[in-house]
């Protein structure tokens, strides 16, 4: 959730650190800070509460802080309130050790009490300060190397961490360690870079190392050495990131979110082209063999947030096409309920970042039970990608806005192609149906583009909703899955209370919430359910609701009851989610803009939820 950057090289560090932190703002934060070393001098630490621009102003955009080695951090408060005092970096009592940290140290109070007995004092409420002083304690006690001191400290820490640490005795070096919290290291032109996510360093290098779980690294100028927690050197392969640095910039758009909405046709096309070869779906790079697919008796889709909504839509498609029972679960619930998994099942973990804490824990629980796993992730080399038995990479590219758009759309494509291929291999569809589904999928990017080009009507409608108190989304079947995502988009960026309901459940209590003027958005993309959902909408209108209908071209009778109608191109009903979600993304976006809110960085939210 927080962001970490680091740099050691020939250039001045502070401007690079601030630039890197700006690329991590989407992760969410309430304060920020940097620490820079100028040769053998003590580290200069500058911290600020609030937006990164406050820190930039305090440092004259980094120009007033001299030194070629440094670390930086954006903090999301977990231990201690948002304040300059609690912001990172933190230092030992004598300034010997300075560090930044992502994660949660669960036994920090126990460790803190021990350090107080040893004479240490504490100025903040954070668990990070405890880690810094614990490392300092072991560094002085054993008079060993930084790697030794870090190792002694980490074996006593319970919880998750990504640490970037500087030692006074090693002025041009940074030491890194991680457990269950992401970190990436890059090298270029005799300089080294550290980031908790790829965009932080993408401007400077595409040559990166992925530090593994419970590993450490010694970062020098253009040189990185890796260690296990026993202090033994280990080898790492240098990887090349394919993402374009331009993709992490706004490129003339007002917000990242609207840019990423516009990027969806290409992202969907790229993801389709990655698995469709000569008109056929090829899952060889995903890793699942035909024999394994034939043996699957149950599919468990486990995810959080929007990725969970992908799973809800995928359940309908997978069961319809492949005739395999599918269970969709929230990762935060799955990991704690002692699940009973079929040994011949397949657990599918969906996560844009590949680092979502609950999803990663669910993956590990599944592997512990010996069940085959598949990760659908966007970030290459992420924890889920490395630990899953098989991985399906979506090609959304960097997604900066907190509210997902293109990553969601590419996850849907992954689900569709898996369902179609599973159905073919298991003999549930004919060759003609197989080809027909693939051909229809290949029309999706162009149809998304057509919807985006007609956004002005939605922009006008959104401007009328800025004072809405409640908005309800209703649908049946796949339309319910669409409603879930539309509702989340609305509430997370416009701050309007919004809920999604299965339309058939309205009469079981929900309809009592309808008042005069309450906006009810009905999603009607499934032909066999159209009349039933329309009937539910009419029932809402009779109680004073203001209706918006979202359906496919041709269903113009919706206008007899809806106060505002939105149409999407026709497609196979199984794939309707890919089209119907676009107007709902645009609606949430334009309502937020009309209210003057921070679209890309909504309050209290983080892009990558890497702690519980």
Which residues does each predicted region cover?
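Glycine-rich oxoanion-binding loops at beta->alpha junctions
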Residues: 68, 72-85, 275-291, 314-350, ...
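Conserved short alpha-helical segments that host acidic/polar catalytic motifs at enzyme active sites
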Residues: 1-250, 254, 266-297, 336, ...
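Catalytic-loop motifs flanking and including active-site residues across diverse enzymes
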Residues: 127-130, 310, 314, 410-415, ...
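Active-site phosphate/pyrophosphate-binding segments
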Residues: 264-268, 272-300, 390-519, 592-612
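Generic C-terminus detector
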Residues: 231, 546, 561, 571-612
């Amino acid at each position: 959730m927080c962001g970490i950057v680091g740099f050691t090289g020939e250039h001045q560090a502070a401007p690079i650190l601030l630039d890197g932190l700006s690329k991590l703002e989407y992760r969410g934060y309430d304060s920020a800070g940097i620490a820079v070393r100028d040769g053998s001098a003590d580290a200069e630490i500058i911290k600020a509460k609030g937006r990164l621009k406050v820190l930039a102003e305090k440092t004259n955009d980094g120009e007033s802080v001299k030194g070629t080695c440094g670390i930086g951090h954006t903090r999301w408060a977990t231990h201690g309130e948002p304040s300059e005092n609690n912001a990172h970096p933190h230092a030992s009592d004598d300034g010997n050790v300075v560090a930044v940290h992502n994660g949660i140290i669960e036994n920090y109070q126990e460790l803190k009490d021990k350090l107080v007995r040893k004479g240490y004092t504490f100025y903040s409420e954070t668990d990070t300060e405890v880690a810094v002083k614990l490392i300092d304690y072991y560094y002085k006690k054993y008079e060993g190397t930084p790697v030794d001191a870090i190792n002694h400290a980490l074996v006593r820490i319970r919880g998750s961490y990504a640490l970037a640490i500087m030692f006074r005795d090693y002025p041009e070096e940074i030491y890194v360690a991680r457990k269950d919290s992401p970190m990436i290291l890059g090298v270029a032109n005799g300089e080294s870079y550290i980031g908790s996510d790829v965009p932080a360093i993408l401007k400077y290098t595409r040559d990166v190392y992925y530090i593994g779980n419970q590993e450490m690294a010694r970062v020098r100028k253009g040189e990185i050495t890796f260690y296990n927690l026993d202090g033994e050197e280990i080898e790492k392969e240098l990887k090349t990131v394919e993402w374009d640095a331009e993709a992490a910039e706004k490129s003339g758009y007002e917000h990242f979110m609207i840019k990423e909405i516009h990027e969806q046709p290409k992202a969907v096309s790229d993801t389709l082209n990655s698995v469709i070869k000569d008109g056929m779906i090829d899952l060889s790079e995903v890793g699942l063999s035909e024999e394994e697919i034939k043996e699957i008796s149950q599919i468990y889709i486990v995810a959080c947030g929007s990725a969970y909504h992908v799973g809800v839509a995928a359940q309908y498609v997978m069961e319809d096409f492949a005739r395999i029972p599918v269970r969709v679960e929230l990762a935060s619930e799955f990991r704690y309920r002692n699940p009973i998994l079929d040994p011949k099942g397949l657990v599918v973990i969906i996560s844009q970042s590949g680092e979502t804490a609950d999803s990663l824990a669910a993956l590990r629980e599944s592997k512990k039970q010996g069940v085959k796993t598949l990760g659908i992730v966007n970030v290459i080399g992420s924890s889920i990608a490395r630990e899953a038995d098989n991985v399906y990479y979506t090609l959304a590219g960097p997604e900066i806005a907190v509210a997902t758009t293109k990553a969601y759309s590419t996850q849907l494509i992954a689900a569709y192609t898996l369902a179609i291929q599973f159905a073919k291999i298991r003999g549930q569809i004919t060759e003609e149906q197989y080809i027909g589904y693939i051909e229809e999928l290949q029309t999706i990017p162009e149809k998304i583009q057509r919807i985006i080009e007609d956004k002005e009507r939605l922009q006008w409608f959104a401007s009328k909703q800025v004072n809405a108190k409640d908005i309800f989304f209703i649908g049946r079947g796949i339309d319910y899955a669409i409603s879930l995502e539309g509702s989340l988009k609305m509430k997370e960026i416009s701050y309007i209370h919004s809920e999604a309901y299965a339309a058939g459940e309205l009469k079981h209590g929900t309809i009592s919430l309808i008042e005069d003027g309450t906006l009810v958005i009905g999603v009607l993309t499934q032909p066999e359910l159209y009349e039933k959902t329309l009937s539910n909408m009419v029932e809402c209108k009779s109680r004073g609701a203001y209706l918006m209908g979202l359906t496919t071209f041709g269903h113009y009778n919706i206008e007899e009851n809806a106060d505002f109608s939105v149409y999407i191109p026709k497609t196979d009903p199984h794939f309707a989610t890919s089209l119907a979600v676009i107007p709902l993304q645009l609606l949430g976006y334009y309502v937020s803009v009309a209210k003057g809110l921070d679209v890309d960085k909504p309050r209290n939210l983080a892009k990558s939820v890497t702690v519980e």
